[in-house]
Amino acid sequence: YVDGYPGESCFNCVMPGMSEIIVITSGKGGVGKTTTAVNIAASIGYYGYRVLLVDADPQGNATSGFGIQKRTVDRSTYEVLLGQCSARDAILTTPFKGVEVIPSSMALAAAELELADMRDRVMRLKEELVRVKGEYDFVLIDCPPSLGMVTLNALSACDSLIIPIQCEYYALEGLSQLVTTVRQVKRLYNPGIEIEGVLLTMYDGRLNLTL
């Protein structure tokens, strides 16, 4: 608790002029990934920090969650990844204090195939985010529910990741695959990447697996 508010001390470790890129990913859907990303972004913004949320999920629920109508989006994460616009040109303001968004669009679903034949296909998001990173205290990336090319771009660009995991058996199986992918990214593309932690979601104390 700081000044009567729970959680504020979690962000006091950020030094002035420093910023951190954090990926929210699980490698599968339905585990509360987007809910986690939206709530962390809104909470950090509430405490006075500058936050950029990059919606890299074609479903675009994080975009909608911050009051942006997807049908009105002209520039999205898709255009940024394909080099059709800069990250700065895709940024939109939101009604939420301190939070700006690079929105998603349904076109992002096609990015997996289009990126496959491109040069530096895994580093394209990083190349754009380094140009705007210094304008924010935190950059959060909400990933798609898969370990494809878009997620690899996010992992290659980030400093750390948070892994939401549902308290059930098959989620544990998916965690192993994600950790293996992170190790490969660390070896090949991003030696500084670290796992911030695993966040248990949809907790049910009646289940043995939860305990």
Regions found by a protein language model. Name each.
Residues 1-211:
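P-loop NTP-binding core
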